[in-house]
């Protein structure tokens, strides 16, 4: 059993929104690892960060991600920082990983009203967002098999693009039968 798609990206890139819509389009369930972490720990992510620190949060996160990769056959949405763990990056190998790309300006705009993102809390969120970008973008690119720009694209268009890539993730391969049954 393996997820149909694993979504990764910066805060505000659309992992939750796109995840819900993609799961619906595929007729499968969505598992958000941030929600699974909160359920398992019985505390919010912000509380885990405040009480136990980022290192302990990342340990719990890796455990949850590994279990989800083994047990979930729908769409899996990872927390924005999951890829910072070498163990998570290793576990993603061989899975269909969709990187939802976003610009700094759009990411700051989309996360503006949120108080549940511990690494963006406090003054100068734009600078913090840019720092996350410089740290994480190379990691997202390394683990992804599909990349999609979410800037100025509505969620429906993003999902349609992902669906087209899931149907044919490597367009330079020999033709194969498709669900549409189109004759060639």
Curated annotation (Swiss-Prot):
Annotated EC: 2.7.1.71
Q: Where in the cell is it found?
A: Cytoplasm
Q: In which pathway does it act?
A: Metabolic intermediate biosynthesis; chorismate biosynthesis; chorismate from D-erythrose 4-phosphate and phosphoenolpyruvate: step 5/7
Q: Where does substrate bind?
A: 34, 58, 80, 136
> Binding of ATP: at which residues?
12-17, 117, 153
Record keyword Metal-binding present: yes
UniProt superkingdom: Bacteria
Catalysed reaction equations from the record: shikimate + ATP = 3-phosphoshikimate + ADP + H(+)
Q: Where does the record place Low complexity bias? A: 169-184
Q: Which Pfam families does this chain map to?
A: SKI
- Its family? Belongs to the shikimate kinase family.
Q: What is this protein called?
A: Shikimate kinase
């Amino acid at each position: 059993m393996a997820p149909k798609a694993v979504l990764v990206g910066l805060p505000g890139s659309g992992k939750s929104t796109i995840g819900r819509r993609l799961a619906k389009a595929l007729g499968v369930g969505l598992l958000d690892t941030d929600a699974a972490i909160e359920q398992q720990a019985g505390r919010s992510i912000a509380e885990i960060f405040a009480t136990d620190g980022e290192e302990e949060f990342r340990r719990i996160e890796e455990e949850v991600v590994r279990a989800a990769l083994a047990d979930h056959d729908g769409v899996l949405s990872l927390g924005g920082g999951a890829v910072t763990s070498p163990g998570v990056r290793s576990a993603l190998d061989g899975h269909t990983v969709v990187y939802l790309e976003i610009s700094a300006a759009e990411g700051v705009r989309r996360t503006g009203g949120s108080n549940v993102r511990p690494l963006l809390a406090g003054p100068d969120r734009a600078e913090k967002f840019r720092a996350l970008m410089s740290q994480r973008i190379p990691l997202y690119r390394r683990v992804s098999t599909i990349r999609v720009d979410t800037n100025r694209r509505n969620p429906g268009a993003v999902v349609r693009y992902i669906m087209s890539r899931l149907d044919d993730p490597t367009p330079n391969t020999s033709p194969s039968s498709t669900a549409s049954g189109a004759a060639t």
